[in-house]
Regions:
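Active-site helical microenvironments for divalent-metal-assisted chemistry
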Residues: 1-211
Length: 211
């Protein structure tokens, strides 16, 4: 069994073990990390990156710890999964406060390879949320548009230095993510579009005051 198969089996068991289902559809949660891993695979990701994509929500959402990932999959996979895991806790404040805690942690911890996984995660989540919950999408899309600017603008994204140096322009997944978010925003009813725009502006202003 290779590392990707092992990661998929482990993640499926971890998410099932806490009864986690995919929001809106009720399908087994593993469908999401499998979809994220497939996006990473088609983007040329290494086996370790694909395994980390399979595992990216295990520390955050299940009983799995960093040490479990480290012992079973090695330091590189564990490092990426940890970097991708939200750090904010419910007691850290309201949604905005927790959002900024997570953004700051992602900005500090993501590297070129884990940024690929984060973009894949954003793409798959955006497609699901805009399909099933337009009201929440106004909030969600504002946050993702903000994250695309803060986490990925001018950042290194890719499998290796060689790939980045040989690639003209932005990483294809960044282009895809920006297009998906922009298209989803354009498809919102006018009232929700302007609500999302106001949220984005407020996040940008608050972030600027925190720097």
């Amino acid at each position: 069994m290779d590392i990707v198969e092992k990661a998929q089996m482990f993640a499926a068991g971890a998410h099932a073990g806490v009864g986690q289902k995919r929001k809106y559809t009720g399908e087994d949660y593993i469908h999401h990390p499998v979809a994220v891993a497939e996006i990473v695979r088609r983007s040329g990701g290494t086996d370790e990156m694909i395994a980390a994509a399979m595992l990216h929500d295990t520390i955050e959402d299940t009983q799995v710890t960093f040490d479990h990932i480290f012992n079973l999959f090695g330091d590189r996979v564990a490092e990426m999964v940890d970097a991708l895991s939200n750090k904010a806790q419910p007691e850290d404040g309201n949604r905005e406060a927790r959002f900024f805690i997570n953004v700051r942690a992602l900005r500090e911890r993501l590297d070129m390879q884990s940024r690929v996984i984060k973009l894949a995660d954003l793409i798959h989540n955006t497609e699901s949320i805009t399909r099933h919950d337009q009201k929440f999408a106004a909030q969600y899309l504002a946050e993702k548009a903000f994250m695309l600017r803060v986490l990925f603008a001018d950042a290194e994204i890719g499998v290796s230095d060689e790939e980045i140096e040989s690639r003209p322009g932005a990483h294809p997944l960044l282009i895809e993510a920006e297009k998906i978010v922009a298209t989803a925003l354009a498809q919102l009813p006018e009232e929700l579009f302007y609500k999302s725009d106001r949220i984005n502006a407020a996040l940008t202003e608050k972030w600027g005051s925190m720097q």
